[in-house]
Structure formats: C-alpha cells, structure tokens
Amino acid sequence: MDKLLIRGGRQLRGEVLISGAKNAALPELCAALLTDQPVTLHNVPRLQDVSTMLKLVRNMGVAAERDDNGTVRLDAGDLSIPEAPYELVKTMRASVLALGPLLARFGHAKVSLPGGCAIGSRPVDQHIKGLQAMGAEIVVEHGYMIASLPAGRTRLKGARILTDMVTVTGTENFLMAAALAEGETLLENAAQEPEIVDLAEMLIRMGARIEGHGTSHIRIQGVEKLHGCEHAVVADRIEAGTFLCAVAATGGDVFLRHARADHMDAVIDKLRDAGCTVAAQEGGVRISSSAPACEHLKAQSFSTTEYPGFPTDMQAQFMALNVIARGASMVTETIFENRFMHVNEMVRLGATIHVEGKVAMVEGVQQLSGATVMATDLRASASLVIAGLVADGETLVDRIYHLDRGYDRMEAKLRGLGADIERISGAAA
C-alpha cells in the first residue's frame, strides 16, 4: 500500500495546473451511455475513480479509450449489459449515476448499491424516489437496485421531482434520465454546483433541452434521442481549493492555472479574511501568503453547506490551516456524518482540536511535529498532506489510495511547487 513521505517547512512557489473536476467527469462519463453515438471528453483527470468508471462502462460493452493528454473517447453504440456489478463499484459512490442513463435509454438497469468513502450516510432513496416519480419500477434486492419501466411503456415520463434534501448525484441522475423522458420534468430543490452546470451544458451539446441549471429549479423537456458531442470537463474547484489552503498554510506565491475563482467564492472569502492575498487573473487564480501562519494568518470559523456556501469537501483542508493559524475557530459540519475522522490524526501531529457532535473547536498552535498518520477518506487525506507540509520533521501519510481517488498526481504537483514530498510504493514501504 503506497504512502507519502513529507518533509515539512518549505514554502510553495510557482504554477500548478488544475485538473478537470472528478465530480463532473464521473457523471459525464455516464452521460455517454445516453447515446449510441461517439462522445469525446477532454480534461478528464487521471484518478482511481475515473479508472473504475471506465472499467465499469467497458464491462457494459462500451468502447472507451483514454490517452495521456486527458482525452477520453466513448462509444456506447454496442452497449449490451445495462448492469453495474458490485465487484466493479464497491469502492466508488458514483456508480449510482449509471442508473438514470441506463433506465432512460434501455428501459431497465441493475446497479449495485454504491461503496466509496466511509463518511456517513449518503442514502440512495432520493434517487429511487425521483425515478419512481418518472414512472420507474425499482426494487432493492441482494444489494442491487433493479429498475424497469412498466409493461407497455418505452420511455420514462416527465414529472415534478422535489427531493427531501439537496442531492448532487440525485440532481445529476434526474437530469440525465429526464433528457430522454417523455414530456417535461421539473427539478425543485436541485443542486446548484458548477459540476451540475457543466453536466447540463454537455447534455445540451448532445441535444437535450434544459433550462435553469445553476439554480434550484431546473426544467427539462425530454427528447426522443440524443447525439454524440465533444466536451471539456470543468476545472476541479476542490483540487484548486486544496492547493489554495496548502499555499496559505506553508506560505508562498502560486498561480493555479485553469482554476475558476467564481466557483470558489466561499473558500476564497475565508482565505482573504484569514490574511491571504487571492486574486482572479487571466487563465486562473493567484494566491500569496506569508509564513509562519501562526503569526500572519487568523483562524476562521465556518459551517459547511450546499453550494454556493462553504463546501463540505473543503472542510478538512481548511481545518488543517486553522490548526496552525492564530486564534481559535469553530468548524461546523452540516452535510455528512462522520466527517471529522481526520481530527485524531491531526492531533497526532500536535493539533489542538475538540469535537462535540457536528462542531470541531480548533485552537491554533505555533508548530506541528511530523508523525505517521493514516488517511481515512479522500478529503481527510488531503488535509493530512497539508498538515505534513508545515510540520517539523517527517510525516508519513498511510493509505493514500484514498487520495488517488480524487487527486490527479498530487505529490508530483506539490513537488513542482517546491515541496519535499515523495511516494513510497507498497513494496518499498
């Protein structure tokens, strides 16, 4: 099992290329299932979850090729197995995104209940509820969601879908299913994330009729057939936010190419309040910060919430900054359960954190000290890398397969900015 060895204390300087967003690439790979014509996606990140999704669609009979420049070409014309087996999706939550497209195009689908990060309950009941509103018959048996259309029907039917909570993957599933449904679908309480907007723009390129994406009310007029398209995946705002927090923590000056400041308002506002200089520039975002953080940065309290609020996927990384900033802060997690699993590992590095329910109280310290820590989920692993970059001595981050699920060669990008970081292969570790 690979590990990362980090020798802390170096500032980060230079330019880093922000990859395409994992949370846009995964649904967009599934959107290719909606058509029998070729689809080309550019700026697809090299991530474990993307590899798993490509393995999954190939297993269905989709021709899928990926080159070294981030381009993926898919052709689902010969798709013959509308199923997502457990063996292929047990490590990935996004497998549920295959349900809507398969059901919409073929009238039946069998998708395993998803795996992925162990960060609390992420129920699929909202997906099932929404697709049932569109006429689907769905049962859950032996760990699988088995969906079909009623006898005599060949298409889903448009419907008003109001979910009990804002759900990103649910909104994506309904968007894809409604694109081929008969009649109009209205999504109320829809997620507004940039990745939702990017998926909708791809579907529109394929011939879908969608209005209101980027708001809480999305209207879709179903069409009988979608065609192929060429589309570039939007830049990953969470990867960009992670690098912003890393530079804030270590000090330095970095230009994040392709980063979109307008997709990170909540995070950038907090970084500016902390004392960093963050500016949108042509082609990206620049951040500069002074070290040490305990003298130059002020800790910031925040609560996670749905976009455009502070993203839950940035909670752990910003906490790593608060740990070494001046003063006390309160971090409130409102989206997922069990998303403070990085806290115990940060405490091993010398952090002062106390958790009560959904709130973590952080008291900034002057210095962290390197230690061996264990990643527990994707964003927790990124927070431990940030902490390791500022810790005195060596930090060894174990179980970084979590990191590889969501970050495109993170250690190589950090090394390019001056960090002393290396991957130790499982065989050598």
UniProtKB/Swiss-Prot annotation:
Top EC category: transferase
Gene Ontology molecular-function annotations: UDP-N-acetylglucosamine 1-carboxyvinyltransferase activity
Pathway assigned to this chain's UniProt record: Cell wall biogenesis; peptidoglycan biosynthesis
InterPro entries: Enolpyruvate_Tfrase_dom (IPR001986), Enolpyruvate_Tfrase_sf (IPR036968), MurA_subfamily (IPR050068), RNA3'P_cycl/enolpyr_Trfase_a/b (IPR013792), UDP_GlcNAc_COvinyl_MurA (IPR005750)
Modified residues (2-(S-cysteinyl)pyruvic acid O-phosphothioketal): C117
GO cellular component: cytoplasm
Record carries keyword Transmembrane helix: no
Transmembrane segments: none
Keyword annotations from UniProtKB, A to Z: Cell cycle, Cell division, Cell shape, Cell wall biogenesis/degradation, Cytoplasm, Peptidoglycan synthesis, Pyruvate, Transferase
Location in or out of the cell: Cytoplasm
Record-annotated active site: C117
Any Gene Ontology biological process: UDP-N-acetylgalactosamine biosynthetic process
Record-given protein name: UDP-N-acetylglucosamine 1-carboxyvinyltransferase
Organism per entry: Variovorax paradoxus (strain S110)
Record gene name: murA
